[in-house]
Amino acid sequence: ESSEMSGESSSRTSLDIPDVQRTLFKELLKTGKPVVLVLFTGRPLTLEWEQAHVPAILNVWFGGSEAAYAIGDVLFGAINPSGKLTMTFPKNVGQIPLYYAHKNTGRPLHEGKWFEKFRSNYLDVDNEPLYPFGYGLSYTTFNYGDITLDRTSMPMDGSLTAKVILTNTGSRDGA
């Protein structure tokens, strides 16, 4: 979406990619050439169609004057994409608001029970977002080892330190 479509005083009832852009994108996919959706946006969008039809989505938000160089380095494999989402992307605007580590309805859908009447879960979509807070992929793989905490309990306003052994098990550098 354009920068004028997000931010203060820029509310939209649909969080889909604008129709003219989706039409162009569908035409590009018809060519049979490899296509990557490079997503310039200032907010989470609903991308279920794109996720189902596109082999790769790179969310770049709105970058600065050198963004094109950085995006090119990622697309051509010079560097590894390593960002994680700072916001949750919904499947549908009806799921909004979505919060990290919170159930999004009063009584969420039970595993394996798609339709339950008289519950405040969604009847037409599951409870999971399209992309949760912290989601992100990489050109490499990692193994997470044991986690240790510096204490077994924490007071209300306290803090703790967690340590984890992280090993890059892939053939590429990554973060």
What do these predicted ranges mean?
Residues E1-H53:
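Hydrophobic helix-and-loop "lid/oligomerization" segment in the mid-to-C-terminal part
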Residues F40-G174:
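Secreted, periplasmic, or luminal enzymes acting at the cell surface/secretory milieu
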